[in-house]
């Protein structure tokens, strides 16, 4: 455990941190994600992303253009894990928060088996909201994520598209986050 380079400006934070990133333009989001992704590549962290395809493909293309020498690292199966929409509902289920915590634990401990690696997990909250959650249910999910990651070498970044998220959901979720960036 220790301090990690966030890959965004000159920010650093402790492992076990959950950061909310608020944005309203995809180009701003890509700049932030490129830095986080590259910092994870440099330190050989496991990177997991639950992003919509509209962000995922441009992110990988922009990374290939900006960091062509490091692109091979992203193609290693244990290095970058991209999960699509169908996995999101089973992973972030407000009806079974204990199972969600267990899935986070198993993902983390799987990354420790051969070569221990820290985890950088990027979650687009819109993927979670497809389950038609109430603001309170979203806040509970964020709270559970915080509990699950606080004792691990895990950086959790939750993305909030201000163009899409209802204000009541945003405020409920942000009450659970200690760190909020506005891009």
Short names for language-model regions:
Residues 1-183:
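Non-catalytic regulatory/interaction regions at protein termini and inter-domain linkers
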């Amino acid at each position: 455990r220790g301090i990690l380079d966030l890959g965004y400006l000159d920010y650093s934070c402790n492992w076990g941190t959950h950061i909310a990133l608020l944005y309203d333009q995809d180009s701003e989001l890509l700049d932030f994600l490129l830095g986080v992704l590259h910092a994870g590549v440099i330190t050989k962290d496991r990177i997991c992303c639950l992003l919509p395809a509209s962000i995922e493909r441009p992110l990988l293309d922009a990374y290939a253009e900006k960091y062509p020498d490091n692109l091979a690292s992203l193609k290693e199966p244990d290095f970058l894990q991209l999960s699509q929409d169908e996995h999101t509902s089973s992973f972030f289920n407000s009806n079974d928060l204990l199972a969600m915590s267990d899935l986070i634990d198993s993902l983390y401990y799987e990354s420790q088996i051969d070569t221990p690696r820290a985890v950088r997990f990027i979650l687009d909250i819109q993927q979670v909201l497809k389950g038609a959650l109430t603001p309170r249910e979203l806040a509970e999910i964020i709270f559970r994520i915080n509990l699950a990651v606080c004792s691990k070498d895990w950086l959790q970044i939750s993305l909030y598209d201000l163009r899409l998220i209802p204000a009541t959901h945003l405020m409920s979720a942000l009450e659970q986050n200690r760190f909020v960036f506005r891009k």
